[in-house]
Amino acid sequence: MPEGRTLLTMDPASSFGTGSHATTRMCMEQLDALTLDGARILDVGCGSGILACTALLLGGRHALACDIEENAMRVTAENMDKNGLSGLRYSTRCGDLLSDPALRQELGGQGPYDVILANIVADVLIAMAAYLPGWLAEDGHLILSGIIDTRAEEVRRAFRQAGMVIVNEIARDGWVMLCCMRGKGENS
C-alpha cells in the first residue's frame, strides 16, 4: 500500500456499498480531497457504512449513519469494527427521514455537520433538499451522489434553490457526484 494511504476493509453483506460502484468511488475521492480532522459526519442512506467509515479513517471525529434498512445498521457496525472504529466514534439510526418527522428532528438536532453524505437516487436527493442544507455547518460540505447523469440538472437545481453552491462535480460511467457548500464557489 502506498505511504500515507489508509486501508479500508469492507463486507457489504446485503447492503449497498462495496466501493466498486462509480457513485461510491466518487464520494470517496471527494472525501479524500477534504480536510476531515475533527469533522462531524452525517451519512444518509449509509448502506454498508462505507462512506462513514472512510470519513472516520480520514480523520473525522464522529459519524452518524442512517438508513431505511435495519440490516444496514448491523452491517455498518460490523464494518466499523473491522476498521478499528469504536462505537464512541459513530452511531446509527434506522428510519426514513422523509416520512418520519421525529427522525428528521433528531438528525437535524445533532447537527450542524461538517460533512453530509447522501449517495441515493435523484428523487430522494431532490426531496432531501428541503432538510440537508439546514443541517450543514457554515463551512461544511454536502456530498451528493447516486445521480444518474440524465437527472443531474434536476438535483443541481433543487440544491441551488436551497441555497447551496456546487463547488465540485465529478461525472463517471453515467453517474454524477456533486459537492456543495453554502454560498461559496463559482458555479452558483
Language-model-derived ranges and their functions:
Residues 34, 68-187:
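S-adenosylmethionine
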Residues 6-8, 36, 65, 163:
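Hydrophobic alpha-helical segments and their boundary regions
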Residues 14, 18-97:
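Conserved SAM/SAH cofactor-binding pocket of Class I
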Residues 1-17:
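Non-catalytic substrate-recognition/targeting regions of SAM-dependent transferases
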Residues 6, 38-40, 140:
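Nucleotide donor/acceptor-binding cores
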Residues 1-3, 47-52, 104, 125-128:
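Short hydrophobic/aromatic-rich motifs at helix boundaries and adjacent loops
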